[in-house]
Amino acid sequence: MLIIWEKKDIFQSTKQIFKLEYEKHMHNYVISVKNSYKRREHITQEFSKHHILFDFFDAITLETIERACNELSISLENSQLSDGEKACFLSHLCLWKKCIDKKLDYIAVFEDDVYLGKDANSFFMDHNWLTNNQFDFIKTETFLQERKLAFSSIDLPNNRKIRELKEPHLGTAGYIISQKAAISLLNYVKSFPEEKLLPIDHMMFEQYLYYKSSSPIYQMIPAIVAQEFILYPNQNNMPSSIEESRLLRKQNKQKRPLLDKIAGELSNLFRKTLGKLLRTRVTFY
């Protein structure tokens, strides 16, 4: 494959780097703050290495939160989310709306600190494998944790499988949704009272997971997307811009009643002992 490198702007999307017709391929969007030059350089190099076309989606920022809320007809004024969490939340919702408005069959969404696994272009350059299996919602990312998955699996190319996710697996750095799933997710999130809204990964991969009208969420095994802080915890070249908000949320979390705390500890004990037999470690490859 011929690669054309534009020296004047290494951060442009790879649809200008590769001589291919983008419309015939998966629509890949990387959420990134416009002036995050280091992260954008990393993504350009990572996706170019795998010969994958993508577009940067300029992330919502503190300055554009109000405008994004108006465009989405949603209010976050009384939510408990920090400004950073609001911006992240809205960035994902804007992409779902883009998928719906442009009538795209599928979109793949990434955050800008990810690494891609082996043969990634087999999954992010063509969506026939999704259409053929009628998948609507796939988590391509992992936190390298053990998760409860459906026993049955569906084989994918290059020694990967798909299994339905049966318990929360947080993170929004890598997922694929169909237009049908985008509509379902957007309607679900917008139906929530704003004071009950949680960070977007909790809404998608925890709350929505148990929603009776949700599209099934499938986990790719091994996962093909992982963030830098997961794969290289000591490297920290791209620190999270909302990690402070998450830590503050944990510190300010309301203390649970004693009985709830005991029940939680027993649940954790089961998960770490007998529960391990029911779970699968979601590896990265």
Located regions from the model:
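Intrinsically disordered, low-complexity regions of eukaryotic proteins
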Residues: 8-11, 203
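An acidic/histidine-cluster motif and surrounding catalytic segment
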Residues: 18, 22-110, 114-285
